[in-house]
Every structure is written in structure tokens, then in C-alpha cells.
Amino acid sequence: MRILILPLMALLASCSSAPLPPDVPPSYSEPPAVATDGFVSVTTSADIPLSIEDLRAFLLDTPFITFLEPTDTISPPIAEETLIGEWLSAGAVRRLQLEDGHYVIERVLENRPELFSYQAWVFTNAAARGVDHIYGVQRFIELGLKETRFEWTYNVKPKSALTAIFVGRQVPELTEFMNTGTQAMAAAAGATANVE
């Protein structure tokens, strides 16, 4: 019995430890098809006293990723490199370098005034063990002439039913990460409305 337990314990220990950042950034690889179900999803939102057009212009000048703050296990992006196309155009691909030295590759799926969606599928951090891909959606909902609801949904597609359990355990921290970034962006964007 001991012969079986020791390798199992070693395997579990290796799975729980965080991988080291790569020496070389990952290259582009073909993305999987975007799933239609089986996601673990988190949504956050904020109402901002700007029109959709003005809010989108603000985010063009000040990219949303600049408002993301680290949590205990989630590292925010600190740099980006466009690999294919022109970022924000459908089909464009970029590589994000995270604060902890890891990388994520993502692509634009759709970009309209009221909706921006993207897919992330290359991860060099621990997410690679349990996450197949992420389908992100940012909606811009008109509430009035000068008010927009920004709604951000993060749909995480686990690799299996087993990894879905572990992904589900990350929901509170993912919620904190998303809420903090969304509220910081909303405050900064809202402040521009007061100087118009």
C-alpha cells in the first residue's frame, strides 16, 4: 500500500505547487472553440456617469487592465504585446505579461460599441492545469443620456468535472479581483465626467 501512496502524494504535491514563470514567453497556438456551457462564471458591474461613447473613449486612452490589482493568488497584467492584427479588432491576438512573470494569450472575439468579448487560452501559471479557456464579456448598457452600466463577466471553462471543483474554489478571489478593478475603473472614468 505504501508503494502506491507515496507516488500519489508526490503527484498531488507537484500539482499543488505553483509552476515557475517561463524563461521564454509562450508562442501563439490555435485556440480551442469557445464553449457554450459548463462555465464557472463571475459577473461584476458598475454604473458610470458617462455615455457609452465617452466610456469607450476613456477605456481606449486608459486600458482596463491598468486598473487590475493583485490578490493572494491572482497576478494582474503589467505589459502587453500584440501578436496578430490590431488590438481591439476582431481576431487580434495579444500576449499579456503578468506581475509574477507568467503569461496569458488572448484574442478578441467581438468588438461593438455595446459589447467587447475575448478568449484567453494560453496560460503559463497554475491555471493551465485546470482551465481550458476563459470567455470574457464586457457589456456597455445605456442607462440614460450620460450614464452607462459596465458589466464584466468572466466565464471560466474547466478542463474536467474534477478541475471544476478547484476552479469553483477560486470564485471568491476572482470576484474580489474583478470587483476591485471594476470599481477603480468606474471611479476614474466617473471623475472625468466631473471635469467636462
Locations of the language-model features?
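Positively charged n-region of N-terminal signal peptides that target proteins for export
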Residues: M1-L4
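C-terminal motif of bacterial Sec signal peptides marking the signal peptidase cleavage site
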Residues: L12-S14
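Residue-level preference for beta-strand/loop junctions
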Residues: G38-V40, L88, D100, D132, ...
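Solvent-exposed, polar/charged alpha-helical surfaces in well-ordered, non-transmembrane soluble domains
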Residues: E53, A57, E176-N179, Q183
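Beta-strand/loop substructures that line and gate deep hydrophobic ligand-binding cavities in soluble
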Residues: A120-E176
